[in-house]
């Protein structure tokens, strides 16, 4: 068995793409594409489908190979609500994505109440999936 005994960062292989958001959990799918999810951001202003809308979670596809790769806005991913008042904010945060066969699974979590209030913490979870590599998304029970 081969063991990993260390890693090193190669700065010349890092490509900063300028997206607005954080976390960027990523998975490699059967169609040889990468899929990544952002939290707390608007995405990429130069990508088709960009609206400037703030998302707690949004999934993108990554096409091509570095340094000539690009991001794709997945129109089938639901625009999860994000309101202007605390009670309507912070609904679902995407904290993990994985590809298995021709499906994508995305883990979402939700807080007990808005973060403006003391004692806020993540208490709930939800699993959504795409049976067709990002074209459509369903709840874990198969409902839209």
Q: Where in the sequence are the language-model features?
A:
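Beta-propeller domains
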Residues: 1-17, 27-88, 108-143
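Structural WD40 beta-propeller signal
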Residues: 29, 98-100
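Glycine-rich, often proline-containing surface loops adjacent to acidic residues and nearby aromatics
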Residues: 100-107
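Beta-propeller and closely related beta-sheet repeat lectin domains
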Residues: 22-24, 86-96
